[in-house]
Amino acid sequence: MKRTPKWLAIEEMMRPGRLTRDGMLGNDSRAIEEILEADNKRVASLGVTHADIAQRLRDLTAVAKSRLGDPVVVEETLELRIEEARGSIPCPFKHPGRARKAVVYCTHLPSGQELVWTELGIHMIEAHGFYEGHGSPYRLEPERAVKLLGIKPAEKGDT
């Protein structure tokens, strides 16, 4: 498959030291198009959408923000904490706007498992179906997110 300049430029922006210290691709050797295709299939197989996942992350982020960095337990199963830094970061897909530099740490209390995401990550999931590459510090595995955050497939007829 011949790669287009558009995708090569996006991938370049995701490399370490460009927008973030560690980059967004981790140790994933696949092309960005392959990462997107694989995650699209994974999310579809779960019966949810990128928007469903992003909305749940956005809702939890809002709760964490309201606590100004202090931990908060939500729904008796999730402990949230947010770390915010000055500034903002652009979308590597050249999407308009910028995301605040914020990292949310979410511990699933029954299992002790942790999920970590960023505000930019929420945008990239919703607008681009991008969960970051394997090995990236902020890679969000769709299956884990759906399971640990209790994201349910929409019922037929739900809007």
Question: How would you name each of these model-derived features?
Answer:
Residues 1-159:
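Alpha-helical interaction/linker modules in multidomain eukaryotic proteins
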